[in-house]
């Protein structure tokens, strides 16, 4: 049976939870708290790919002893490997659009949402801990870029205003794509919508002036349609804290190319 190592249903952690709920598939849930660095504990599933994945602390699928990381790949795997509704579009062009959106939003929106979430919610959590012990834990994190991402949160080295500005282009692109269309990749709800929803929905809390019914009416309508899906409600109901929107860890490294 598929095992899913996951945390609160928010951000990238939400994606496979929605997909599994849409499929109605049984799986073994392995909850871990990345803010307690449980992902670095001996015996935690890992391989070369998971250690270097762009999403850093994201969820892992374990299938037959193999570890699958990176949530856009996980979504495609689950769609093909698990019985249930087909969430991949029919046409080649719409399938291309699923992958194009995943790449664009993963690199263009994922880092922004993660940075804003960490600045607002994770930094106070880290600041309340013993500084010496915490820095000793962070010093052991490899690779260096992964360690620096945690240190940036702890040290408050996040320019929230600059990150807010970086929302403009991807949000405008989404709003334009949803003008006259219900879904992102063809006439039906698909993996593209699951992938994007997990990154866009938190902006209602993190950047309400950017994503709202007045400024982005088509995007707001799309979010509302997905909010109502039983699978999405079921995934969100898995929260242990009752506040999944406050659950953030450093995510995808920002693009080096702007």
Predicted regions and their residues:
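GST-like domain detector, emphasizing the conserved glutathione-binding G-site
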Residues: 1-141, 253-254
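A general structural signal marking secondary-structure boundaries and capping sites
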Residues: 82, 178-181, 230, 239
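Short flexible/disordered coil segments
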Residues: 97-100, 124-130, 174-178, 182, ...
